[in-house]
């Protein structure tokens, strides 16, 4: 039977650099996190700000702190009645699929 792992939402630790964020989560005793870049990483205002170098910094910080990324937190509204708004939200989700894969996050 798999070990039970306790995690925390990254943004409950405030907006920080990936290194500081993962360090704080690990020091608080958690082994995994939900990482929502726009809510938890300083300087990220939208998913467009999530660059490959930032994803790599988060991946490296996760590894260094031994805090896994269980969830790539992608906060979107997929039920807009307005088709253009809905399509914009779908595009956000699609842009984060490769990010989730790179981070090893099994859930979005």
Language model regions located:
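N-terminal pre-domain/capping segments
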Residues: 1-107
